[in-house]
């Protein structure tokens, strides 16, 4: 299993995205894209806190109960964001997509508008996640679910699927899939071709 990753800032601003990839073995990987919420305070700090929390939970490896491990990481991120929000007197939050692969099994979760795609050997690319977004009558979009520093752990659904023999899994921020040069753009691609 191989991976590539890329993250770049939008035009004239700080990169508010963070990428984390942990590969404990050739058959295991944890990959995540965090997209700090630009409408809140310190989005780049929010996404880094999320990435650090996941790293802390998964640094000892992928356990047998992966959904519980993902929930623990998101709970830790909420706790850390809440502390940082209080310390700064600010509002922090981020959208996040996480993929955990162990052998031929994948667990994934997305909160906000970070997307996860699966391309199988027949080149059919399908979206595995739904955006947690509400668009008002003026066309302004708002996240309806995200990791934020208010002490409230969001509703987290962890999905599981068996992977085909050959696949590509992509986790990407809205700046990537909307191809907007103004927004930050981040992607992690995991490839299994052997």
Can you name each region flagged by the protein language model?
Residues 1-194:
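PP2C/PPM-type serine/threonine phosphatase catalytic domain
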């Amino acid at each position: 299993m191989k991976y590539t990753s890329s993250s770049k800032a939008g035009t004239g601003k700080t990169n508010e995205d963070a990428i984390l990839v942990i590969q404990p073995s050739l058959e295991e990987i944890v990959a995540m894209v965090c997209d700090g919420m630009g409408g809140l305070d310190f989005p780049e700090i929010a996404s880094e806190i999320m990435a650090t929390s996941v790293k802390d939970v998964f640094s000892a490896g992928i356990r047998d109960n992966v959904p519980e491990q993902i929930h623990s990481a998101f709970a830790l991120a909420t706790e850390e964001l809440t502390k940082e929000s209080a310390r700064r007197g600010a509002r922090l939050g981020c959208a996040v997509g996480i993929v955990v692969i162990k052998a031929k099994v994948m667990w994934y979760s997305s909160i906000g508008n970070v997307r996860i795609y699966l391309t199988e050997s027949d080149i059919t690319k399908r979206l595995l996640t739904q955006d947690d977004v509400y668009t008002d009558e003026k066309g302004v979009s708002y996240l309806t679910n995200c990791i934020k520093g208010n002490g409230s752990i969001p509703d987290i659904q962890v999905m599981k699927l068996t992977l085909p023999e050959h696949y590509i899994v992509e986790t990407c921020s809205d700046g990537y899939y909307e191809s907007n040069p103004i927004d930050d753009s981040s992607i992690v691609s995991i490839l299994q071709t052997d």
